[in-house]
């Protein structure tokens, strides 16, 4: 098994050099305006001839490049399924809403997943939920029936988002790869903390939180939801006794500091893979690092477009892998 990944990891090590460091991100933030930031990215090799001057096309092309690299490594794509779950379940959510509301203009699909937009829409339209992966079938049908009969879009979101978290966690439990196990644990725990924070701000009930949160080993859904009912200080107090104590400090600092911590926690989870040479770990870590890099660049470009001060943009910027 280790020999299988030797070439792949060597290739990834060569590519890691071109990942943006914190200092590169600082240079991007220091660009005087949005156009200069785009130019900076293009000079760094982002996008291609067809995407020139178009931020969305540049970012999309970078996502495509990431998966092109992975496919070139001749590693089974099933190893990366868990990373595509957020997009896959998003497509299910978009399809349910489009079919139930008849609104075809609002819902954007991802095409670079196992079930792209048109195929997902047809499955929902035909109510052929058996064509969905096991982890999506029950949630797809339940969300469809809920939205059709109650018109409750938020409950529809909760049903599908919870199923996505359960699928990620299950993938972690079933994977022989430690990076997937750790990624799944951190992803679900951080999502649960986000749900608790949002629920506290919007005065949601315990029942709502327990329906939205996914069980995981590193947090107690029961204790976290109970803390959320008591207030933000209680959430922070609970988190201080867990592996997510830094999240409590970020939460106390500001909403944007907390959002930043949520993503940074995932990067911290995968960082040890920089020192492994004979497992699939560095390859998966590279994909996650690229996704984080693209998300960070998107945040900076949005800040530049809206003419936010550099300090305000910097507060939102994520930690880099390299």
Model-inferred region functions:
Residues 1-322:
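N-terminal domain-start signal
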């Amino acid at each position: 098994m280790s020999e299988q990944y030797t070439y792949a990891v060597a290739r990834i090590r060569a590519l890691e050099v071109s990942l943006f460091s914190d200092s590169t991100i600082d240079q991007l933030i220091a660009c005087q305006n949005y156009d200069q930031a785009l130019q900076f990215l293009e000079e760094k090799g982002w996008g291609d001839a067809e995407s020139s001057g178009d931020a969305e096309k540049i970012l999309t092309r970078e996502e495509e490049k990431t998966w092109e690299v992975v496919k070139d490594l001749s590693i089974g794509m099933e190893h990366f399924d868990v990373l595509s779950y957020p997009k896959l379940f998003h497509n299910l959510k978009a399809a349910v809403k489009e079919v139930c509301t008849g609104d075809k203009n609002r819902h954007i699909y991802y095409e670079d997943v196992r079930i792209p937009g048109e195929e997902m829409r047809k499955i929902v339209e035909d109510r052929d939920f058996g064509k969905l992966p096991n982890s999506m079938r029950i949630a797809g049908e339940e969300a469809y029936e809920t939205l059709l009969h109650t018109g409750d879009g938020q409950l529809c979101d909760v049903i599908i988002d919870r199923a996505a978290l359960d699928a990620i966690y299950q993938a972690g439990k079933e994977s022989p790869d430690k990076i997937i196990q750790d990624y799944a644990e951190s992803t679900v725990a951080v999502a649960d903390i986000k749900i608790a924070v949002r629920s506290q701000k919007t005065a949601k009930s315990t029942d709502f939180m327990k329906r939205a949160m996914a069980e995981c080993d590193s947090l107690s859904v029961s204790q976290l939801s109970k803390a959320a009912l008591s207030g933000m200080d209680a959430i922070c107090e609970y988190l201080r006794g867990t592996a997510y104590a830094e999240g409590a400090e970020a939460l106390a600092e500001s909403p944007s500091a907390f959002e930043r911590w949520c993503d940074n926690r995932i990067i911290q989870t995968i960082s040890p893979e920089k020192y492994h040479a004979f497992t699939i770990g560095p390859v998966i870590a590279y994909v996650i690092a690229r996704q984080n890099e693209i998300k960070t660049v998107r945040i900076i470009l949005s800040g530049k477009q809206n003419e936010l001060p550099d300090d305000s943009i910097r507060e939102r910027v994520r930690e880099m892998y390299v």
